[in-house]
Amino acid sequence: MLDWHKGGGRAPGPGSFGVRFFMMLNWNELEAQCLSCQKCALADKRTNVVFGVGPRDAEVMFIGEGPGENEDLQGEPFVGRGGKLLDDMLELIDLDRTKIYIANMVKCRPPKNRDPLETEQYACSEWLSRQIALLDPKLIVCLGRISAMKFIKPDFKITREHAELPGKTGRRMETKQR
């Protein structure tokens, strides 16, 4: 399971079901459990749980921060303005959206599209951890600061490190025009 800081809210420990329970679920069971989740306050105002979308054998997984208004209404990640930008970027690198799996750090929309709180991320951590375990992607692409802080490093600064490829390869990829 991912390393999450414990906080207040409705998810006092590793979750109401326990880590072992989550790690035994298949895709359909995981999604069914997630759709009825009440582990944090975001559940109170959501229209839909935004579980994730894409082939469940994809080699590439994109992880965003959380659903926006359009995503909450449609129950699918990256269908609003962010989805249009993602589609444009995927087209530029000749990557077919139907070949990737897309999920978010949290499965319900934070109010006013604010960043997900640490407690909300923690409440959703079991869902995301199991999605990653089931998918077993070759590559995880972080979309935004919140996911980069969890998967790359806690003090990740997107304005400073957005063009860096983490790891020991020593490679750099330019992501903006100079």
What do these predicted ranges mean?
Residues 7-9, 13-18:
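Residue-identity detector for glycine
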Residues 22-178:
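A polyanion-binding, active-site-adjacent surface
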